Amino acid sequence: MSSMGKKELNVKHWADQIADEVIERVENDPRLKKLVEKTGYFVYDEKTPSGIIHIGSGRGWIIHDAIAKALRNKGKNAKFVLSSDDHDPLDKVPSYLDKEIYEKYMGVPFKDIPSPVEGYSSFGDYYFKQCTDLFDQFGIEAELESTGE
């Protein structure tokens, strides 16, 4: 900006703003500080792989990844952890699947239901990997886990 009476704006990326707020909160809470010193910062999200995952779910993953990266850029030990809630039970057969085949799995955890496509360990594994296999294309760095393990 010119010096003709205009103020120079100091604008931070939203992920950096959130990272700064998290760091400040941790620094001001002795219990949190002690925990984070042992474990690092965890940015956590969870998805139930109940069928085709809506693209809107990706918004959360992009946000969480950006916050974890902002924390790391500030020298913090941080990681984004995405958990598949595959221990959750099937409560509705998706309309695009054969009801006769999958209705018998009502109430069964997604990790224990056969995949609709060969090559996957379970229903939950198939639908979770439909998205997470694309993370590299979007630059998302996540540690993947399963609630069923």
Stretches found by the model and what they are:
Residues 2-149:
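N-terminal Rossmann-like or analogous alpha/beta NTP/dinucleotide-binding catalytic cores
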